[in-house]
Amino acid sequence: MTWITPKKAIMLAAAAEGGTKLNAFDNALLKMGIGNVNLVKLSSVIPAHIEWLDELPKNIPIGMLLPTVYAHIESDEPGSTISAALGVGISEGNEGGLIYEYAGYCKREEAEDMVRKMVEEGFKVRGWKLKEFKVVSAEITVKEKPAAAVAAVIMFPY
C-alpha cells in the first residue's frame, strides 16, 4: 500500500442517537457523510499547505480508506451531556499544523476550551507561531436512547 501526503482536509462534527452506543456512533458518522468509508486514525500533525474544504467531495467511494483525526464519546446514561471537539492550529506561512482532540461528559464550550489550550501548548513546545485556530464540536444530551458525539478532520489525497 502506498500512502500519499494529504492535500485537502475538512472539519466535521455531529451528534446522534441509536439503538446501541455503536449505532449512535455510526449514525453520527452518517450525519457527517462519512458513514460508508473506513476511517484510518491518525495522530495530529497537519501537512504543510493543506487546502481546507467547506464541503465533502462528491462520490467518495464506499469503503475508501480516509486518514482521519477524530474524537468521540458515547453514552447511555439519560440526562448526561456529552461533547467531542477538535482544535486545529495552523502555523504562520501554512507550513504545517496540529490537531488536538477531546471528548467528555461536558458542554461543547468546555470541550472547545480544552482543545484550544492543547493547540496553544503544542505550538509553544515546538516553537511554532500560531496563525489561525479552528474548532469543530458536537454536543448531545442523552435521552431514552444511547447517544454519541463525534468531531473529525478528514484528509484527502486529491
Swiss-Prot record:
Q: Which InterPro entries match?
A: Pyr-dep_his/arg-deCO2ase (IPR016104), Pyr-dep_his/arg-deCO2ase_sand (IPR016105), Pyruvoyl-dep_arg_deCO2ase (IPR002724)
Q: Does the keyword RNA-binding apply?
A: no
**For the modification Pyruvic acid (Ser), which residues carry it?**
S44
At what residues does the UniProt record annotate the site feature described as Cleavage (non-hydrolytic)?
S43, S44
Q: Which cofactor does it need?
A: pyruvate
Quickly give the catalysed reaction: L-arginine + H(+) = agmatine + CO2
Q: Does the keyword Lyase apply?
A: yes
**Keywords per UniProt:** Decarboxylase, Lyase, Pyruvate
Q: How is the cofactor bound?
A: Binds 1 pyruvoyl group covalently per subunit.
User: What Gene Ontology terms for biological process does this UniProt record contain?
Assistant: arginine catabolic process
State its Enzyme Commission number(s): 4.1.1.19
Q: What Pfam families does the record point to?
A: PvlArgDC (PF01862)
Give this protein's Gene Ontology molecular function annotations.
arginine decarboxylase activity
NCBIfam families reported in the protein's UniProt record? pyruvoyl-dependent arginine decarboxylase (TIGR00286)
Could you say which protein family the record assigns here?
Belongs to the PdaD family.
Q: What is this protein called?
A: Pyruvoyl-dependent arginine decarboxylase
